[in-house]
Design a protein with these regions (language model features):
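C-terminal transmembrane helix-loop-helix hairpin of multi-pass membrane proteins
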Residues: 1, 149-156, 163-256
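N-terminal topogenic module of multi-pass integral membrane proteins
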Residues: 1-119, 217-256
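Generic multipass alpha-helical transmembrane bundles of integral membrane proteins
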Residues: 73-196
Length: 256
């Protein structure tokens, strides 16, 4: 949280405060695990793709083509299949196709949904990112995966730092694809891996996928950013809490 807060403040004038997401995630990876590329497991693929997505978002900062959102969604779906490839190869063809298509669709929807928030107020993206990260991390943690839970919670706390700056200053803080793309990729892949390798029930993913859509579609009152953020938080956190609750009903208590 603190690293993300500092990063958002430092890069605010350059309109790159969205780098707070990858900064908060990277420091969590450094502290929570001894990261190496070999063997290239699904969890390590999440880290690698998260870092690559941040770099890609930085390169695409000045590009505003409409077709780009669809291209990024397709790339996100392909990244999901690559991440869970080894696990899918151990399943029957029917299960492999079903899980592969489901994971690809989930990540693609998150990438598309978070990218659509770029056309709205930055407050919507920050609120959706906070709820999506906390919902994914909390559900993964309850679903018996402490490391995946830390990944999601790191995203949520980093987005919360971004949101806090807007609430305290009562001013919008630019997000950009450096915020939305890494968050969607990491949260999406974390959810997919938690479903396949842990005890996260698959039907929590559609609930989490509605968070960016809800933040995009909900009408906001014509009032201060603080009031608008409370409205967004109530809606998005309700969905995140629903995903965590459903996971708890299946998996039981949080593993110690």
């Amino acid at each position: 949280f603190l690293v993300a807060l500092i990063t958002a403040e430092l890069f605010q004038r350059m309109k790159l405060s969205g780098l707070a997401i990858i900064a908060g995630f990277a420091i969590t990876v450094y502290l929570a695990s001894n990261f190496t590329l070999e063997p290239l497991t699904a969890v390590r693929k999440i880290v690698l793709l998260g870092l690559c997505s941040a770099l890609l978002a930085l390169l695409l900062t000045l590009l505003q083509a409409r077709w780009l959102v669809w291209l990024l969604a397709i790339l996100g779906g392909a990244a999901a299949i690559w991440t869970v490839q080894r696990v899918l190869q151990q399943q029957t063809p029917q299960v492999m196709i079903l899980w592969g298509a489901g994971c690809a669709a989930y990540v693609a929807i998150l990438v598309w949904g978070m990218d659509k928030l770029l056309d709205q107020q930055p407050l919507r993206a920050a609120s959706a990112g906070t709820a999506l990260g906390i919902g994914t991390g909390g559900a993964a943690l309850v679903g018996a995966s402490a490391l995946l839970g830390q990944f999601g919670l790191a995203l949520g706390s980093a987005a919360a730092a971004h949101l806090l700056i807007q609430m305290v200053s009562n001013q919008s803080l630019s997000t950009g694809r450096t915020f939305t793309l890494p968050l969607a990729i990491i949260a999406g892949l974390t959810g997919c891996v938690a479903v396949i390798s842990a005890q996260l029930p698959w039907y929590t993913l559609p609930i989490l996928a509605t968070i960016p859509l809800a933040a995009w579609l909900v009408p906001l009152p014509h009032s201060s950013i603080r009031i608008q953020s409370l409205v967004l938080m109530l809606l998005t956190f309700f969905l995140a809490a629903g995903a965590i609750y459903l996971t708890w009903r299946v998996a039981g208590d949080v593993p110690l």
